[in-house]
């Protein structure tokens, strides 16, 4: 198990290095691909905890007031790449599309790194622990 955690940490740091080497700006990528739904300040949509008229939840905030930090890196990556419905399954419907066809893996990781960089240390520590438990 420790070997898997070490491997996951190594791969995550490698992806970050690739993103930095390729000059990827996670904040700019977020603004281009995510801000239209999740807000330019990561604030999400109003009443994000209540179902809308279409029966779907509005886009949640990605700042410390939301729940993004409650999830480990793997699930955050898969939701971003494949879309929420594909990851959650069971007929769950979501407006969150997958970006696997339009963003490279390193770009997705750069966006997630940007989001995580905005959280206070308490939320970052909790999220790191969740990642290690995956």
Task: Kindly give the residue locations of the regions a language model identified.
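Bacterial N-terminal signal peptides
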Residues: 5-14
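Electrostatic cytochrome c docking/interface patches
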Residues: 13-30, 125-127, 134
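Stable alpha-helical elements in mature extracytoplasmic
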Residues: 22, 30, 72, 76, ...
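Gly/Gly-Pro-rich "capping" loops immediately C-terminal to redox-active cysteine motifs
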Residues: 27, 43-77, 98-102
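Flexible coil segments in periplasmic/lumen-exposed cytochrome c-class electron-transfer proteins
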Residues: 31-32, 40, 88-134
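Short, cysteine/histidine-rich loop/knuckle motifs that typically chelate Zn2+
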Residues: 36
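Generic structural signal for secondary-structure transition and capping sites
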Residues: 42, 67, 84-85, 120
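A short, structured beta-strand/loop element
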Residues: 80-81
């Amino acid at each position: 198990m420790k070997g898997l955690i070490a491997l996951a940490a190594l791969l995550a740091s490698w992806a970050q290095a690739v993103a930095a080497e390729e000059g990827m700006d996670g904040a700019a990528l977020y603004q281009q691909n995510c801000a239209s739904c999740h807000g330019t300040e990561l604030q999400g949509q109003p009443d994000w905890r209540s179902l809308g008229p279409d029966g779907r939840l509005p886009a949640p905030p990605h700042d410390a007031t939301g729940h993004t930090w409650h999830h480990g890196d793997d699930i955050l990556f898969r939701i971003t790449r494949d879309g929420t419905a594909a990851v959650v399954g069971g007929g769950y419907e979501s407006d969150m599309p997958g970006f696997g066809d339009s963003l490279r893996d390193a770009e997705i990781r750069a966006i997630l790194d940007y989001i995580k960089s905005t959280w206070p240390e308490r939320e970052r520590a909790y999220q790191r622990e969740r990642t290690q438990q995956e």
